[in-house]
Amino acid sequence: MGLAITLWLPASGYAEPASTTNNTFSESAELIRQTYEEQLFTLPAFKEGHYGLRMYRQTLDPKYSAAVWSDLARVASRLNQFSAEVSTAEQVFLYSEQRLAGYFDDADERSQLRYIATKHMPEYLYLGVDLLGSMARANEYGLKHKEDQLLRQVIRRYDFTKYATDEEMIKAWAAQLANQVYWLRQLGEQDVVQPFIDSFRKTYPDSADKALSAQQYGNKLYGMTHIIFADSEYYQNPIKEQQHQWIFDYFRNNIDTILLRAKEDVVAEVGITFLLAGLEKDPVVEKTRLAIQQAIDKKKGMIPSTSGVFDLADGEHRNVLAIMLLDWQKTNQAPTVKNNPKVFSSLPYGLIRQ
Protein backbone atom coordinates (compact mmCIF):
# COMPACT_ATOMS: atom_id res chain seq x y z
CA MET A 1 0.00 0.00 0.00
CA GLY A 2 1.19 3.48 -0.75
CA LEU A 3 1.46 6.51 1.44
CA ALA A 4 -2.07 7.56 0.53
CA ILE A 5 -3.73 5.61 3.32
CA THR A 6 -6.98 7.33 4.27
CA LEU A 7 -6.65 9.56 7.30
CA TRP A 8 -10.35 10.34 7.56
CA LEU A 9 -13.43 10.49 5.41
CA PRO A 10 -15.20 13.82 5.18
CA ALA A 11 -18.99 14.04 4.84
CA SER A 12 -18.71 13.86 1.06
CA GLY A 13 -17.28 10.35 1.36
CA TYR A 14 -14.05 11.19 -0.50
CA ALA A 15 -10.71 10.37 1.09
CA GLU A 16 -8.23 13.14 1.77
CA PRO A 17 -5.68 13.17 -1.08
CA ALA A 18 -2.16 11.87 -0.40
CA SER A 19 -0.60 15.26 -1.12
CA THR A 20 -2.70 16.83 1.64
CA THR A 21 -1.66 14.06 4.03
CA ASN A 22 2.00 14.72 3.25
CA ASN A 23 1.47 18.44 3.76
CA THR A 24 0.00 17.92 7.22
CA PHE A 25 2.99 15.78 8.20
CA SER A 26 5.46 18.43 7.03
CA GLU A 27 3.43 21.15 8.75
CA SER A 28 3.60 19.19 12.00
CA ALA A 29 7.36 18.88 11.58
CA GLU A 30 7.61 22.63 10.98
CA LEU A 31 5.73 23.31 14.21
CA ILE A 32 8.36 21.40 16.21
CA ARG A 33 11.19 22.89 14.16
CA GLN A 34 10.07 26.44 14.99
CA THR A 35 9.82 25.61 18.69
CA TYR A 36 13.37 24.30 18.81
CA GLU A 37 15.11 26.66 16.45
CA GLU A 38 13.85 29.75 18.24
CA GLN A 39 15.72 28.54 21.35
CA LEU A 40 18.36 26.19 19.91
CA PHE A 41 21.33 28.06 21.34
CA THR A 42 19.92 27.88 24.87
CA LEU A 43 20.34 24.10 24.85
CA PRO A 44 23.40 22.34 26.31
CA ALA A 45 26.16 21.83 23.72
CA PHE A 46 25.46 18.11 23.37
CA LYS A 47 21.75 18.68 22.68
CA GLU A 48 22.38 21.63 20.38
CA GLY A 49 24.92 19.60 18.41
CA HIS A 50 22.67 16.53 18.30
CA TYR A 51 19.87 18.58 16.77
CA GLY A 52 22.02 20.68 14.46
CA LEU A 53 24.02 17.77 13.04
CA ARG A 54 20.90 15.79 12.17
CA MET A 55 19.24 18.77 10.54
CA TYR A 56 22.42 19.57 8.60
CA ARG A 57 22.67 16.00 7.33
CA GLN A 58 19.05 16.13 6.23
CA THR A 59 19.05 19.57 4.58
CA LEU A 60 22.68 20.78 4.08
CA ASP A 61 21.33 24.14 5.24
CA PRO A 62 24.25 26.33 6.41
CA LYS A 63 22.08 27.83 9.15
CA TYR A 64 22.92 24.72 11.19
CA SER A 65 26.68 25.25 10.86
CA ALA A 66 27.03 26.98 14.23
CA ALA A 67 25.30 24.10 16.00
CA VAL A 68 27.57 21.63 14.22
CA TRP A 69 30.60 23.65 15.31
CA SER A 70 29.31 23.49 18.87
CA ASP A 71 29.34 19.71 18.57
CA LEU A 72 32.83 19.87 17.09
CA ALA A 73 34.07 21.89 20.06
CA ARG A 74 32.51 19.40 22.47
CA VAL A 75 34.24 16.49 20.71
CA ALA A 76 37.59 18.30 20.77
CA SER A 77 37.25 19.06 24.47
CA ARG A 78 36.48 15.43 25.28
CA LEU A 79 39.39 14.07 23.25
CA ASN A 80 41.76 16.67 24.70
CA GLN A 81 40.79 15.52 28.18
CA PHE A 82 41.05 11.83 27.36
CA SER A 83 44.45 12.08 25.67
CA ALA A 84 45.88 14.18 28.50
CA GLU A 85 44.29 12.51 31.53
CA VAL A 86 42.83 9.06 30.69
CA SER A 87 45.27 6.93 28.73
CA THR A 88 47.15 4.66 31.14
CA ALA A 89 45.52 1.51 32.54
CA GLU A 90 45.37 3.07 36.00
CA GLN A 91 43.81 6.30 34.71
CA VAL A 92 41.20 4.33 32.75
CA PHE A 93 40.35 2.29 35.87
CA LEU A 94 39.96 5.34 38.13
CA TYR A 95 37.92 7.27 35.56
CA SER A 96 35.66 4.26 34.93
CA GLU A 97 35.06 3.56 38.62
CA GLN A 98 33.97 7.16 39.08
CA ARG A 99 31.58 6.87 36.11
CA LEU A 100 30.19 3.59 37.46
CA ALA A 101 29.40 5.15 40.83
CA GLY A 102 26.98 7.48 39.07
CA TYR A 103 24.65 4.54 38.40
CA PHE A 104 24.71 3.12 41.94
CA ASP A 105 22.12 5.37 43.55
CA ASP A 106 19.62 5.43 40.67
CA ALA A 107 16.72 3.08 41.36
CA ASP A 108 15.20 2.91 37.87
CA GLU A 109 15.37 -0.41 36.02
CA ARG A 110 17.74 0.79 33.31
CA SER A 111 20.30 2.26 35.71
CA GLN A 112 20.25 -0.84 37.89
CA LEU A 113 20.77 -3.11 34.88
CA ARG A 114 23.66 -0.94 33.75
CA TYR A 115 25.30 -0.92 37.16
CA ILE A 116 25.03 -4.68 37.65
CA ALA A 117 26.19 -5.52 34.11
CA THR A 118 29.08 -3.08 34.05
CA LYS A 119 30.50 -3.31 37.59
CA HIS A 120 32.78 -6.19 36.58
CA MET A 121 34.01 -4.41 33.45
CA PRO A 122 33.79 -0.70 34.32
CA GLU A 123 36.33 0.26 31.65
CA TYR A 124 33.46 -0.14 29.17
CA LEU A 125 32.03 3.16 30.40
CA TYR A 126 35.18 4.91 29.24
CA LEU A 127 35.94 2.96 26.08
CA GLY A 128 32.46 2.51 24.70
CA VAL A 129 30.31 5.24 26.15
CA ASP A 130 32.84 8.09 26.15
CA LEU A 131 35.95 7.56 24.01
CA LEU A 132 34.67 5.70 20.94
CA GLY A 133 31.79 8.07 20.26
CA SER A 134 34.03 11.13 20.26
CA MET A 135 36.65 9.49 18.02
CA ALA A 136 34.00 8.28 15.57
CA ARG A 137 32.37 11.71 15.36
CA ALA A 138 35.69 13.36 14.57
CA ASN A 139 36.26 10.65 11.96
CA GLU A 140 32.90 11.38 10.32
CA TYR A 141 33.93 15.02 9.97
CA GLY A 142 37.16 13.97 8.22
CA LEU A 143 39.17 14.86 11.31
CA LYS A 144 41.11 13.15 14.07
CA HIS A 145 42.70 14.15 17.35
CA LYS A 146 46.37 15.10 17.29
CA GLU A 147 46.96 12.23 19.75
CA ASP A 148 44.95 9.80 17.63
CA GLN A 149 47.56 7.04 17.84
CA LEU A 150 47.67 7.24 21.63
CA LEU A 151 43.88 6.94 21.83
CA ARG A 152 43.87 4.01 19.41
CA GLN A 153 46.44 2.25 21.57
CA VAL A 154 44.06 2.59 24.50
CA ILE A 155 41.26 0.94 22.49
CA ARG A 156 43.54 -1.89 21.37
CA ARG A 157 44.32 -2.90 24.96
CA TYR A 158 40.79 -4.23 25.32
CA ASP A 159 38.83 -6.91 23.45
CA PHE A 160 35.43 -5.40 22.68
CA THR A 161 33.97 -8.87 22.03
CA LYS A 162 33.67 -9.25 25.80
CA TYR A 163 31.21 -6.37 26.03
CA ALA A 164 29.38 -6.82 22.73
CA THR A 165 28.49 -10.49 23.20
CA ASP A 166 27.61 -10.47 26.91
CA GLU A 167 23.87 -11.03 27.48
CA GLU A 168 23.66 -8.83 30.57
CA MET A 169 25.52 -6.03 28.80
CA ILE A 170 23.13 -6.25 25.85
CA LYS A 171 20.15 -6.05 28.21
CA ALA A 172 21.68 -2.92 29.71
CA TRP A 173 23.24 -1.22 26.68
CA ALA A 174 21.71 -2.59 23.44
CA ALA A 175 21.56 0.66 21.46
CA GLN A 176 24.91 1.87 22.73
CA LEU A 177 26.63 -1.41 21.83
CA ALA A 178 25.09 -1.27 18.36
CA ASN A 179 26.60 2.17 17.90
CA GLN A 180 29.96 1.14 19.28
CA VAL A 181 30.54 -2.00 17.21
CA TYR A 182 29.90 0.00 14.05
CA TRP A 183 32.14 2.85 15.29
CA LEU A 184 34.95 0.35 15.85
CA ARG A 185 34.52 -0.90 12.29
CA GLN A 186 34.34 2.68 10.98
CA LEU A 187 37.63 3.51 12.70
CA GLY A 188 39.30 0.47 11.16
CA GLU A 189 39.76 -1.19 14.52
CA GLN A 190 38.19 -4.41 15.79
CA ASP A 191 35.17 -5.73 13.82
CA VAL A 192 32.65 -7.36 16.14
CA VAL A 193 29.47 -6.31 14.33
CA GLN A 194 28.28 -9.81 13.46
CA PRO A 195 29.12 -11.37 16.84
CA PHE A 196 27.12 -8.56 18.46
CA ILE A 197 24.11 -9.08 16.17
CA ASP A 198 24.19 -12.84 16.75
CA SER A 199 24.34 -12.33 20.53
CA PHE A 200 21.61 -9.69 20.40
CA ARG A 201 19.23 -12.08 18.62
CA LYS A 202 19.94 -14.81 21.18
CA THR A 203 19.35 -12.36 24.03
CA TYR A 204 16.03 -11.16 22.61
CA PRO A 205 14.28 -14.03 20.78
CA ASP A 206 10.97 -12.84 19.33
CA SER A 207 9.15 -15.64 21.14
CA ALA A 208 10.02 -13.99 24.48
CA ASP A 209 8.59 -10.53 23.69
CA LYS A 210 5.53 -10.92 25.92
CA ALA A 211 7.72 -11.68 28.92
CA LEU A 212 9.76 -8.47 28.53
CA SER A 213 9.14 -5.49 30.78
CA ALA A 214 8.32 -2.19 29.09
CA GLN A 215 11.92 -1.11 29.67
CA GLN A 216 13.38 -4.29 28.19
CA TYR A 217 11.03 -4.23 25.22
CA GLY A 218 12.15 -0.68 24.54
CA ASN A 219 15.79 -1.72 24.89
CA LYS A 220 15.27 -4.45 22.29
CA LEU A 221 13.66 -2.03 19.83
CA TYR A 222 16.36 0.60 20.44
CA GLY A 223 19.01 -2.00 19.73
CA MET A 224 17.36 -2.91 16.43
CA THR A 225 16.88 0.66 15.22
CA HIS A 226 20.43 1.58 16.19
CA ILE A 227 21.91 -1.31 14.24
CA ILE A 228 20.42 0.33 11.15
CA PHE A 229 21.24 3.90 12.19
CA ALA A 230 24.84 2.98 12.95
CA ASP A 231 25.18 1.11 9.65
CA SER A 232 24.02 4.29 7.87
CA GLU A 233 26.68 6.27 9.81
CA TYR A 234 23.81 8.19 11.30
CA TYR A 235 21.64 9.26 8.37
CA GLN A 236 24.58 9.71 5.98
CA ASN A 237 24.13 6.64 3.78
CA PRO A 238 21.08 4.74 2.53
CA ILE A 239 20.50 1.20 3.77
CA LYS A 240 19.57 -1.91 1.80
CA GLU A 241 16.62 -3.69 3.37
CA GLN A 242 18.07 -7.12 2.57
CA GLN A 243 21.14 -6.43 4.72
CA HIS A 244 18.89 -6.22 7.79
CA GLN A 245 15.89 -8.22 6.61
CA TRP A 246 15.23 -9.71 10.04
CA ILE A 247 14.78 -6.24 11.52
CA PHE A 248 12.44 -4.97 8.82
CA ASP A 249 10.40 -8.19 8.96
CA TYR A 250 10.09 -7.83 12.73
CA PHE A 251 8.96 -4.22 12.52
CA ARG A 252 6.35 -5.02 9.86
CA ASN A 253 5.00 -8.01 11.78
CA ASN A 254 4.89 -6.20 15.12
CA ILE A 255 4.17 -2.57 14.27
CA ASP A 256 0.79 -2.50 16.03
CA THR A 257 2.35 -3.86 19.22
CA ILE A 258 5.20 -1.37 18.90
CA LEU A 259 2.73 1.51 18.64
CA LEU A 260 1.02 0.30 21.82
CA ARG A 261 4.10 -0.50 23.92
CA ALA A 262 6.88 1.83 22.78
CA LYS A 263 7.71 5.45 23.61
CA GLU A 264 7.55 8.11 20.90
CA ASP A 265 11.34 8.08 20.46
CA VAL A 266 11.25 4.42 19.48
CA VAL A 267 8.18 4.76 17.27
CA ALA A 268 9.88 7.56 15.32
CA GLU A 269 13.09 5.56 15.02
CA VAL A 270 11.22 2.57 13.61
CA GLY A 271 9.70 4.77 10.90
CA ILE A 272 13.06 6.35 10.08
CA THR A 273 14.67 2.93 9.52
CA PHE A 274 12.25 2.42 6.62
CA LEU A 275 13.02 5.88 5.23
CA LEU A 276 16.74 5.08 5.30
CA ALA A 277 15.95 2.02 3.17
CA GLY A 278 13.96 4.07 0.64
CA LEU A 279 10.69 2.49 1.79
CA GLU A 280 8.62 5.65 2.28
CA LYS A 281 5.51 3.99 0.86
CA ASP A 282 5.61 1.11 3.32
CA PRO A 283 2.54 1.11 5.61
CA VAL A 284 4.83 1.13 8.66
CA VAL A 285 5.94 4.67 7.77
CA GLU A 286 2.35 5.92 7.59
CA LYS A 287 1.44 4.29 10.89
CA THR A 288 4.44 5.75 12.71
CA ARG A 289 3.86 9.19 11.20
CA LEU A 290 0.24 9.23 12.31
CA ALA A 291 1.19 8.14 15.82
CA ILE A 292 3.90 10.77 16.13
CA GLN A 293 1.72 13.50 14.66
CA GLN A 294 -0.99 12.73 17.21
CA ALA A 295 1.55 12.94 20.06
CA ILE A 296 2.41 16.59 19.30
CA ASP A 297 0.98 19.21 21.63
CA LYS A 298 0.01 21.95 19.18
CA LYS A 299 0.04 24.72 21.80
CA LYS A 300 3.54 23.86 23.04
CA GLY A 301 4.79 22.91 19.57
CA MET A 302 6.52 19.72 20.71
CA ILE A 303 6.02 16.17 21.95
CA PRO A 304 6.07 15.98 25.76
CA SER A 305 7.64 13.20 27.80
CA THR A 306 5.57 10.15 28.73
CA SER A 307 4.86 11.90 32.04
CA GLY A 308 3.64 15.04 30.27
CA VAL A 309 6.69 17.25 30.85
CA PHE A 310 7.58 19.90 28.24
CA ASP A 311 11.33 20.37 28.58
CA LEU A 312 13.26 21.46 25.48
CA ALA A 313 16.57 19.88 26.45
CA ASP A 314 15.17 16.61 27.79
CA GLY A 315 12.80 16.34 24.84
CA GLU A 316 15.30 17.15 22.09
CA HIS A 317 15.92 13.52 21.13
CA ARG A 318 12.29 12.55 20.56
CA ASN A 319 11.44 15.84 18.88
CA VAL A 320 14.29 15.93 16.37
CA LEU A 321 13.42 12.33 15.46
CA ALA A 322 9.82 13.45 14.96
CA ILE A 323 10.92 16.20 12.56
CA MET A 324 12.97 13.73 10.55
CA LEU A 325 10.17 11.17 10.39
CA LEU A 326 7.46 13.66 9.44
CA ASP A 327 9.49 15.68 6.93
CA TRP A 328 12.19 13.31 5.68
CA GLN A 329 14.59 14.84 3.16
CA LYS A 330 17.47 12.52 2.23
CA THR A 331 20.78 11.07 3.38
CA ASN A 332 23.90 13.18 2.90
CA GLN A 333 27.53 12.39 3.70
CA ALA A 334 28.03 15.63 5.53
CA PRO A 335 29.43 17.75 6.91
CA THR A 336 33.06 16.94 6.15
CA VAL A 337 36.09 19.19 6.26
CA LYS A 338 36.74 18.40 2.58
CA ASN A 339 33.25 18.93 1.13
CA ASN A 340 31.86 21.54 3.53
CA PRO A 341 34.92 23.64 4.44
CA LYS A 342 32.88 26.66 5.59
CA VAL A 343 31.53 24.64 8.51
CA PHE A 344 35.13 23.98 9.58
CA SER A 345 36.62 27.41 8.86
CA SER A 346 38.41 27.21 12.21
CA LEU A 347 39.15 23.99 14.06
CA PRO A 348 39.03 23.80 17.86
CA TYR A 349 42.34 22.98 19.52
CA GLY A 350 43.28 19.31 19.34
CA LEU A 351 41.54 18.37 16.10
CA ILE A 352 43.43 18.04 12.80
CA ARG A 353 42.63 16.82 9.30
CA GLN A 354 42.93 13.09 8.72
Region locations from a protein language model:
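Membrane-interface motif at the C-terminal end of an N-terminal transmembrane signal
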Residues: 9-13
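Terminal, non-catalytic domain-edge segments
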Residues: 14-88, 92-107, 123-142, 149-161, ...
